[in-house]
Design a protein with these regions (language model features):
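A structural supersecondary motif
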Residues: 237-247
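Globin-like tetrapyrrole-binding proteins
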Residues: 330
Length: 344
């Protein structure tokens, strides 16, 4: 009996330790290197066929791709050779394509309007010399994206106004703004709308790496959200997020009643308005005007104009609803404004 009792006790301890084990890491299909020597590849069905070596189109360059294996690594060196071949200084495409994509990201449209087609069927760049300059900067700076980002956002073109009499005259002459004579007003992307709404409430989880989750169940940034092609994310889908089934070099920008319903009546946006109101109320010593100024700073990055502050103060003081309902309504209005949704 003593031995049996000891056995049961050990089993219970073992079960307790098993319960403390972390869950197994998720698995995914992957590939591994075959070693420094790659298997020979030849055309099937041909006897005594010579092995085919990696290379470009033989009609353009009959020489095989130079491959220098690294004896210190268990790899053939073929992928490294391909990467060097693609990013070679003699290949003008990668630097131009990348510079054009960055320009499109900051200005709403690329210098070349067909970002995935730089061939004869694509649209020629509106400013070829500028595109060449940006591509050269990218190469000369060792492919530093940070340097190119800095050049674009500190340029005179990026710092132009998007409103005013001069802008109106420019819009009449150049409606599509191909000559970059003004800054184009653009709406935030689906991911930016979601992250901005979570960020101003103080809920955004800015941790790097790690597991993500569904949009409505996690406060992590949108870059970490789970993407399922057969199960669209309602929060992002309403603002034209790509479906993940096909490449989309230029996103569609639509204005639909569904977006208004989501922003005004959607439960997710109402939760963000309540969270923003709680954040404003967390500073119990702040005055009403200070809370209004904080709300404007969080939502718009500026302080309210005197007329705006007076209107909000009048609304909050005249409200006869109990609790913080009026403050929640005010926060809801901030989240539904064009100034919150658009970059101008």
């Amino acid at each position: 009996d003593a031995a049996k009792e000891k056995w049961e006790k050990l089993r219970a301890e073992l079960a307790a330790l098993e319960a403390e084990k972390p869950p197994p890491l998720p698995c995914a299909p992957s590939v591994t290197d075959v070693g420094p020597l790659a298997p020979e590849v030849s055309i099937p069905g041909r006897r005594n066929a010579e092995p085919i070596e990696p290379g470009g189109l033989s009609v353009l360059d009959p020489n095989p791709l130079p491959i220098v294996p690294n004896p210190s690594q268990q790899t053939t060196g073929r992928r490294t050779a391909l990467a060097h071949w693609i990013t070679s200084d003699t290949n003008p495409l990668p630097s131009r394509v990348l510079a054009n994509r960055l320009w499109q990201h900051h200005f709403g449209r690329g210098l070349a309007e067909s970002p995935s087609d730089f061939g004869r069927l694509g649209e020629p760049p509106s400013h070829p010399e500028l595109l060449d300059y940006l591509a050269s900067e990218l190469l000369d700076r060792g492919w530093s994206l940070k340097h190119l980002h800095r050049q674009m956002v500190t340029s005179a073109a990026y710092r132009q106004a998007s409103h005013g009499p001069e802008v109106t005259a420019s819009a009449q002459k150049d409606p599509l703004n191909k000559f970059v004579a003004r800054m184009t007003v653009r709406r935030l992307s689906a991911e930016q709308v979601r992250d901005a709404a979570v960020a101003i409430t103080g809920e955004l989880d800015t941790r790097m790496a790690g597991p993500g989750g569904d949009s409505g169940k996690t406060a992590r940034r949108a870059v970490y959200l789970k993407v399922q092609r057969n199960s669209r994310d309602a929060t992002l889908d309403v603002f034209d997020v790509p479906d993940g089934l096909a490449s989309m070099p230029v996103r569609n920008i639509t204005t639909t009643p569904t977006q208004s319903l989501f922003m005004i009546n959607g439960p997710w946006m109402m939760l963000r308005a309540k969270a923003l109101a709680r954040r404003l109320e967390s500073n119990s010593s702040a005055t009403l005007d200070e809370r209004v100024a904080t709300a404007y700073r969080l939502a718009y990055g500026r302080v309210p104009r005197p007329d705006e502050a007076a209107a909000v103060r009048q609304f909050l003081q005249a409200s006869d609803t109990g609790g913080n309902a009026a403050l929640v309504d005010f926060c809801h209005v901030l989240l539904n404004s064009s100034e919150f949704l658009y970059v101008d």
